Amino acid sequence: MATELRATEHGRQKISEKFDELKQKKEGALIGYVMAGDPSAEATFGIVKALVNGGADIIELGFPFSDPVADGPTIQAAGQRALAAGMDIEHYFELVRGLGVEVPLVCMTYYNPVFRYGVDKFVEHAADAGISGLIIPDIPVEEAADLKSSCEKYGLDLIFLVAPTTTDARIRKILERGSGFIYLVSRLGVTGARADVSGSTKELLSRVKTDIPKAVGFGISTGKQAAEVRKAGADAVIVGSVFVRIIEEGNGVNEKLEALARELKSGILGAN
């Protein structure tokens, strides 16, 4: 189940390649989220390696922002710790370059730091560092033309979120302009681990009619939940808050992360 780690001198793996590889094996993907620089840049190397060793197929690496509107308290606190530890854009790209993982890396951040850095420059430097995709939850699809253009120029996937409240008309726009995977929000509100998978998840999966892989996130924390989401028709399960909480607690972090990633991936595999 563990995914081999290697240096990325020969370029980053595309998200579509990873999903094609998993599809051939009839496997669903585990996408693991952590915040870059929490509790330190140095610690992030071991954290990412632990998730990949546990079976994570894609890593979503957060870049901290001071006003993270889509994040719950757990991830907000992680962002504050990362900012306090000195994480900035240049350090983020340096960290990404040094990770040396074979799995695709997705950057999740907010539009303000991207805009201040320069949209085209940010995307170019992200691609150069080894990022394969970009998630910016606070930019509407209607306002993302420049960002989409830069992503196409440098070969990054631009990944949009779809919520139960998203209209069918907007879903169609997202399916036209998004790539890599579609991020389905399994419940309303901000991120955070929750007790069970909502009924709206199945309904949302049925509304999003596309060949682009569908990834469900926000609130998944156990292998049983991951299996339920996979059985409901998701191509991937996104898990974040529970990993970030383990990091915050601080004891035996990498061992716990690897064990939980293995449990989640086993749940996904068992749902086939």
From Swiss-Prot:
Domain of life: Archaea
Pfam families: Trp_syntA
Biochemical pathway: Amino-acid biosynthesis; L-tryptophan biosynthesis; L-tryptophan from chorismate: step 5/5
MF (Gene Ontology): tryptophan synthase activity
Gene Ontology terms: cellular component: cytosol
Swiss-Prot/TrEMBL keywords: Amino-acid biosynthesis, Aromatic amino acid biosynthesis, Lyase, Tryptophan biosynthesis
CDD domains: Tryptophan_synthase_alpha
InterPro entries: Aldolase_TIM (IPR013785), RibuloseP-bd_barrel (IPR011060), Trp_synthase_alpha_AS (IPR018204), Trp_synthase_suA (IPR002028)
GO terms classed as biological process: L-tryptophan biosynthetic process
Record EC number: 4.2.1.20
Gene3D superfamilies named among the record's database cross-references: Aldolase class I
Residues annotated as catalytic: E60, D71
Its job: The alpha subunit is responsible for the aldol cleavage of indoleglycerol phosphate to indole and glyceraldehyde 3-phosphate.
Subunit structure: Tetramer of two alpha and two beta chains.
Family: Belongs to the TrpA family.
Protein name: Tryptophan synthase alpha chain
Gene name, Swiss-Prot/TrEMBL: trpA
